[in-house]
Amino acid sequence: MESTMSPYFGIVVSLAAFGIGTFLFKKTKGFFLFTPLFVAMVLGIAFLKIGGFSYADYNNGGEIIKFFLEPATIAFAIPLYKQRDKLKKYWWQIMASIIAGSICSVTIVYLLAKGIHLDSAVMKSMLPQAATTAIALPLSKGIGGISDITAFAVIFNAVIVYALGALFLKVFKVKNPISKGLALGTSGHALGVAVGIEMGEVEAAMASIAVVVVGVVTVLVIPVFVQLIGG
């Protein structure tokens, strides 16, 4: 059923929830459960449920926000352009690392889903989680997945990387800025880039190229796994 609610409703709810998440994240000095995106998601769902609003009421404005996903993804080219000298110098190492990481990500998700006997539709929904939302959602729909599950998987994956990515890099003593950026972008897409930006220009650029390449590799590799699932 279509909603007559103003698009501003969904936009205001999203911005307010994200603002609260940002405030809590800063106040708790980066406690991972208060990652802004995760808090915004929980608060948004709670607000709609308690207020008796439908998803259609929210999505009038949500679609406007969603429109900016593609331009935001393209904007990753800006930090990459600034570090094009490093891309030229280490291009094959960079590409090999991203491709290997992408394939490993999809393979691990497939094996885990297979191991716990998930339904085929759910498995297909989980496979694109390594790609950014702008790529993962249409890809999931195209292979017979469930977009809502894919969206949750992508966001959950990104939240984990945003909250704990820097910590994991320290634990595994990753010090090279190129390696840091590639790891963040390959595992955490857009929010991985956000962490990279906080670290430096090189990390941001490498994370950006990782997001783009992971998207391409995911699109090429997933049909193989869909055949294994039986689809």
Swiss-Prot record:
Its main location: membrane. Disulfide bonds: none annotated. GO terms for biological process: cytolysis; killing of cells of another organism; programmed cell death. The chain crosses the membrane at residues 7-24, 34-56, 91-113, 149-171, 207-229. GO terms for cellular component: plasma membrane. Keywords: Cell membrane, Cytolysis, Membrane, Transmembrane, Transmembrane helix. It is found in: Cell membrane. NCBIfam families: PRK04288.1. Inhibits the expression or activity of extracellular murein hydrolases by interacting, possibly with LrgA, with the holin-like protein CidA. The LrgAB and CidA proteins may affect the proton motive force of the membrane. May be involved in programmed cell death (PCD), possibly triggering PCD in response to antibiotics and environmental stresses. Belongs to the CidB/LrgB family. LrgB subfamily. This is Antiholin-like protein LrgB. It comes from Bacillus subtilis (strain 168).
